[in-house]
Amino acid sequence: MGRIGVLTGNAGEIR
């Protein structure tokens, strides 16, 4: 799991 970013808006990107 990742954090909620602005690329996808879901917990998929690690920012």
Swiss-Prot record:
Key words, A-Z: Calcium, Heme, Hydrogen peroxide, Iron, Metal-binding, Oxidoreductase, Peroxidase, Secreted
EC number: 1.11.1.7
GO CC annotations on file: extracellular region
Cellular localisation: Secreted
Disulfide bonds: none
Coiled coil ranges: none
Any one GO MF annotation of this record: lactoperoxidase activity
Entry keyword annotation includes DNA repair: no
Enzyme class: oxidoreductase
GO-annotated biological processes: hydrogen peroxide catabolic process
Family: Belongs to the peroxidase family. Classical plant (class III) peroxidase subfamily.
Record protein name field: Peroxidase 3
